[in-house]
Design a protein with these regions (language model features):
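Nucleic-acid endonuclease domains
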Residues: 1-91, 107-195
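Active-site beta-strand-loop-beta-strand hairpin of nuclease catalytic cores
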Residues: 72, 94-102
């Protein structure tokens, strides 16, 4: 897929991102689906125990639940168009009619940053793997605290990212990648921010 930013000056990237988001069919629903999915976690039970009352999962587990529920809730609402991506070529939220509208989901308990596997900073090298370029849903949430307050969704952003936007850890043993400051400024749009 050709980059929508290729050959365009950086000062135009934000406008390009806004255009890409405006043409996405889920742009008006993403916030509601994410917030409902977050509530679904706290309405869940594991055995006889409730999440947030007797069980307090670590951030990685909360991110996993959120990641899964957002995709499942969209698949439930639009069963002929969306499904949870389950093949190596499919995005986390797979659009069966137009795969270019699929969405990768990244969650983090960091205040405002998201992270990915180091491989996201490399171009897709073979046709057996999913394209790392495309729409991304970035969700930041609070961890459980000792104060007992229910954690909240901090930030929901939607945008269009490419492998060049990810910066791998410098250490060769490092397995993580983070986004460039330019990507945060021009390629992710804030849809929701907790007060």
């Amino acid at each position: 897929m050709k980059s929508p930013y290729q050959g365009k000056p950086e000062e135009k990237w934000l406008a390009i991102t806004k255009r890409l988001i405006n043409k996405h069919p889920l742009k008006d629903e993403i916030v509601d689906v994410v917030l409902q999915s977050w509530e679904d976690i706290f309405n869940s039970r594991i055995g006889s125990y409730s999440i947030g009352k007797e069980i307090f999962p670590e951030p990685q587990m909360m991110g996993f639940f959120l990641h899964e529920l957002v995709a499942q809730n969209l698949a439930l609402k639009y069963p002929k168009v969306y499904k949870r991506g389950d093949a190596k070529k499919e995005k986390d939220i797979h659009n069966t009619e137009d795969p270019s509208l699929g969405i990768e989901i990244k969650t983090s308990s960091n205040k405002d940053k998201i992270f990915a596997n180091r491989s996201y900073a490399q171009p897709s090298s073979d046709s057996e793997k999913k394209d790392k370029n495309g729409y991304y849903l970035a969700i930041n949430f609070e961890k459980f605290s000792k104060k007992g307050r229910k954690p909240r969704i901090r930030l929901i952003r939607f945008g269009f990212l490419e492998h060049e936007d990810w910066i791998p850890q410098k250490s060769e043993k490092g397995q993580q990648a983070h986004l460039s400051d330019l990507a945060y400024k021009t390629k992710l749009i804030t849809l929701y921010q907790a007060e």
